[in-house]
Swiss-Prot record:
Native organism taxonomy: Bacteria, Pseudomonadati, Pseudomonadota, Alphaproteobacteria, Hyphomicrobiales
Source organism (scientific name): Rhizobium etli (strain ATCC 51251 / DSM 11541 / JCM 21823 / NBRC 15573 / CFN 42)
Transmembrane segments: none
NCBIfam families reported in the protein's UniProt record: mutS1 (TIGR01070), PRK05399.1 (NF003810)
Reported function: This protein is involved in the repair of mismatches in DNA. It is possible that it carries out the mismatch recognition step. This protein has a weak ATPase activity.
Positions contributing to ATP binding: 662-669
UniProt-recorded name of the protein: DNA mismatch repair protein MutS
GO biological process terms, semicolon-separated: mismatch repair
Amino acid sequence: MNARIDIGNEAFSAAELATAESRASATPMMEQYIEIKANNPGSLLFYRMGDFYELFFEDALEASRALGITLTKRGQHMGQDIPMCGVPVHAADDYLQKLISLGFRVAVCEQIEDPAQAKKRGAKSVVKRDVIRLVTPGTITEEKLLSPSESNYLMALARIRGGAEPQLALAWIDISTGVFRLAETESSRLLADILRIDPRELILPDTIFHDAELKPVFDVLGRTAVPQPSVLFDSASAEGRIARYFGVSTLDGFGSFSRAELAAAAAAVAYVEKTQIAERPPLGKPERESAASTLFIDPATRANLELARTLSGDRNGSLLKAIDRTVTGGGARLLAERLMSPLTDPARINARLDSIGFLIEEPSLCGKLRDTLKHVPDMPRALSRLALDRGGPRDLWAIRQGLQAAGGLADLLASAMLPEELDQALSGLQALPAGLETLLAETLADELPLLKRDGGFLRDGASAELDEVRALRDQSRRVIAGLQLQYAEETGIRSLKIKHNNILGYFIEVTAGNAAPMTETSEAKSRFIHRQTMASAMRFTTTELADLESRIANAADRALTIELEAFDRMTAAVVAQAESIKSGARALAVIDVAAGLALLAEEQAYCRPQVDGSKMFAIEGGRHPVVEQALRRQAGGPFVANNCDLSPKTGDKDGAIWLLTGPNMGGKSTFLRQNALIAIMAQMGSFVPATSAHIGIVDRLFSRVGASDDLARGRSTFMVEMVETAAILNQASDRSLVILDEIGRGTATFDGLSIAWAAVEHLHEANRCRGLFATHFHELTVLSEKLGRLSNATMRVKEWDGDVIFLHEVGPGAADRSYGIQVARLAGLPASVVARARDVLTRLEDADRKNPASQLIDDLPLFQVAVRREDAARGPSKVEEALRAMSLDDMTPREAMDALYDLKKKLK
């Protein structure tokens, strides 16, 4: 019996277990465990023993801590107690869910023979076991382990060296839906691309994992990044591996891919094969994404804007939660995908907007579509489980219900003059196999069990043989009732019962005090065969009861066999139509997203944005989509709408920059964020919270609004702010939108002012982007006199009887103060502190009037950044070219000295 113990925190590691000494001293069962564990490094081993999955040694320590389950011991190994813990097989999914959410990987090891078979090989033979599946965060398909509204991507990162710069590429697969995509990337945008796709698991060569340049990326990803042997990413064999998976001789029909993309795709496929053992999920053909096709949003911006989750990790309070009106799992995932990857192609964006506009104009049709969509199950995930032999009767029902709903939606749309996107969706629905829905409807019962092994999922009439077997089973129940009555009358024991359990099968049970008529005579003893005596009862059987039990057991076995054969036939019919089912499911998701965004637009009074290839950014009556809804829920009054116009001024080709000043609590940060969110919503193809909006395509969006310490990496708030600002100034183009809030506030006043001043100049002269720059450095407002595309804007306030009222309105002009002392008083600072602060402020303001910033600007030369950029654009110097051409490893010392003199001459 296992005892509760304090085993401590030490146990044999996997490497120590695998030694020859360890194996030699192990029991036969433990030797088997050690061998299987050695073949599955990096995974917790769920080792099946009867009705439990047991974990031993280091795995037991980790699992007991992670799951909060009791740590016990099972014997000793090499003189040390063997730590052990376990989970019941019937509840394994619940424990797997927790382990996977914590980033663990689990190897599921099952008994692949009956213990009776093992005994035939010898009394001490160990039951054969093998790993049937590796469960990892990126390769799960079980409904209980997946979030219906989130994709579950496995991603692979590959690098090919050669040429001036190494090639990097990403491939990502969701085996629960069959999505398979790939794209090239660069080290400078690698983290941004990974976070945009948001994989649950990233595999990469161990050589890249230990690359110092990319280490900061993997530090952010934590346990999501999993190093693998570099051979998995071999580009030479990549094309062949992918072709074999899809059963084709060449990838010519799939499109053109770079070597790095093929290496990443092949590694992802190989990892899927490795984790699924003998099964193959039905993946779609790999689709290539161009980096230029989506709006680039850097990691800091994505976090600051709280697109899918808040900074605390909650979905509530995010933009996605605020705009999600979808009613299907596929629709929710597609909406999230569009939000995280807004487009840069006006034609594709406007096609999405056309769908929303059409459904707004057809409210009755939109309502009927949504009513039908509410009954659509998650067909892609049901299909994947069926293809991987993990499906059940309810997955077949999901396919049947989805096909039925698709037919209803097609009927609703067929007579309408549809815009392009909805017309393509209709074609996808009409291409679904009509006969498959009929087959499933005529075969599946109305009430379905969870597991196919439970039987009872075929309706009466689906199989004549099954009907016959079921009749025998039902008839047997009546026969048993008759036998019970007969035996009671024959013995005179009115309390006699016929019962059943898994050990004895069917048996007759009477109380010990009433058993005499069944035991006193030899005739009675020969008729009622004694099976078991208990404290208060005795159990018997008869020849006819044993015969009946045999017939019932055979009938039940035969019934289940018939049902399982029918299940396999239905599954094969479904999997044969996998491509059309996935296309139809995608069409359902497109309709769901369009209908949901149409409802959102009507409900929240959003407008259709004008999106084109210009550099316009003109928002009238813009609102923050999340804050506005929160105010409405809390009855906090209407949201104050504001205009924002960063469009090129007359005669200028580049967009404008607004320098925004105003008090704390005046609404600056909300105004900054809402304009960034409006740009994202417009380019994802959604109506936006404004009365009108004209947005020229934004290629890159940067938002530095708020910052915090990064203690884990030894970076202060100011350092984090500077790193994020550097990324913006180095990467923003003339098509970018930049949102900056209070740059320079984390250091000394003059240092901060100087940095903010230089940053504004750089944005205006070098980046030439559209931007909003909020600041408390009022000295910066004088820059509008010299920078033609810079305009001052301020958050308006009203002073009344010594108090300040925040109007949350944006207007032209500059604030002359920040009202920080008034805010401090509202926050409850002691009156003496507030009074002293007023006195200090008065003295500082008097000193500032003697040296105003307007004098400073006349003394400072502007546009130096632009001059330096022009110098850089002239190309490398002769010295740089000569250095690049040198092969230093092949030079003699004399040749190196000559080369150095030659370089010195070139400098002259």
